[in-house]
């Protein structure tokens, strides 16, 4: 599945569930006894009825059964958390605690848990799947050049921040278009890269983007309140970039949001008489705080319009965005990073 032999430590990592930022391929050698004992406890009351040859289930205590299941789930979760903490402390090699933390972000593992539906693009070929696993755990990607087209030493982290080839722009534009498509379902007057009203006279003291050609990525009406125009600016950051390693992923997203707010918020409020929402994402699938609030609001409005469950809409949104980011990452990994090859 991985395409190579793995170490004992890597096998332990892969055995943890996706919600712990891992892979979810359990090791039956380690979990067989625990799962058997759990099965015995869950079926104990039913087994006793069978032994006593009861003809109906009137003596079957369903409430007690539910309590047993609940306690087993709690115990299992505690066991997995201990395993996760132990593995995180013992990590050596390319996979770091930072990788584990990034992979635990909400929605980061949605590409592993969704149905592989080719009709909506929720599937990878063999090489793409293995490359995705390597990116997820910081492993070396097979058959990639030692040096980047820009002349620097090649690595996954360098590939995802190298401007040559236009892949950073492609990643941004793809996510911008996905968000615009979501908004068209429930918002009005959706525009991509709308021009802002020029600053004149009394507005010359406004901080942030002052140039006449300034434009955020998207604008639309009706998300936060009826008729209100909101501007959005998208940014996808790679949190394992060398300049970010001293900052936690959550702090990094908040910092980048503040930078976006300083650039556009005052102009959106005072000149456009609208509002501004920064949409920050990471290459691992994490969302910034304001992006999370935005998607919750969007999912709520879509679910009410389509009569679907909110959880289903939100899950679809997370999966769609995750695949959008993942595909742009995979293209950058295998693409040519030459200066003359500008895309976008």
Protein language model features and the residues they cover:
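Short Cys/His-based metal-binding microdomains
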Residues: 23, 27-33, 37, 145-175
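Conserved, well-structured core segments
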Residues: 15-21, 27-30, 218-221, 229-236, ...
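Extended C-terminal regions of large enzymes
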Residues: 7-137
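E2/UBC-UEV (E2-variant) core
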Residues: 236-285, 291-318
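Acidic carboxylate-rich catalytic motifs and surrounding loops in phosphoryl-/glycosyl-chemistry enzymes
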Residues: 4-12, 16, 192-198, 274-285
């Amino acid at each position: 599945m991985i395409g190579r032999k793995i170490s004992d430590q890597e096998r332990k990592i892969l055995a943890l569930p996706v919600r712990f930022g891992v892979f979810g391929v359990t090791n039956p050698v380690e979990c067989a006894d625990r799962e058997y004992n759990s099965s015995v406890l869950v079926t104990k009351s039913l087994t006793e009825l069978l032994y006593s040859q009861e003809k109906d289930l009137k003596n079957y205590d369903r409430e007690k059964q539910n309590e047993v299941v609940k306690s087993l789930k709690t115990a299992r979760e505690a066991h997995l958390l201990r395993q996760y903490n132990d593995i995180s402390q013992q990590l050596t090699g390319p996979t770091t605690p930072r990788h584990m933390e990034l992979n635990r972000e909400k929605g980061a593992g949605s590409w592993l848990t969704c149905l592989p539906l080719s009709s909506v693009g929720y599937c990878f070929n063999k090489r793409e799947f293995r490359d995705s696993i390597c990116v997820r755990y910081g492993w070396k990607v097979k058959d990639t050049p030692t040096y980047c087209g820009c002349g620097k030493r090649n690595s996954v982290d360098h590939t995802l921040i190298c401007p040559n080839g236009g892949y950073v722009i492609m990643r941004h534009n793809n996510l911008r278009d996905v968000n615009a498509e979501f908004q068209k379902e429930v918002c009005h007057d959706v525009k991509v890269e709308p021009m802002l009203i020029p600053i004149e006279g009394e507005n010359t003291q406004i901080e942030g983007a002052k140039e006449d050609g300034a434009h955020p990525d998207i604008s639309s009406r009706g998300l936060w309140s009826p008729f209100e125009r909101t501007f959005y600016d998208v940014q996808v950051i790679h949190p394992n970039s060398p300049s970010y390693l001293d900052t936690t992923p959550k702090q990094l997203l908040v910092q980048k949001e503040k930078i976006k707010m300083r650039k556009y918020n005052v102009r959106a409020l005072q000149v456009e008489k609208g509002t501004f929402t920064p949409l920050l994402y990471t290459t691992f699938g994490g969302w910034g705080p304001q992006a999370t609030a935005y998607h919750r609001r969007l999912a709520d409005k879509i679910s009410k319009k389509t009569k679907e469950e909110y959880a289903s809409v939100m899950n679809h949104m997370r999966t769609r965005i995750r695949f959008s980011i993942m595909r742009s990452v995979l293209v950058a990994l295998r693409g040519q990073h030459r200066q003359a090859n500008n895309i976008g």
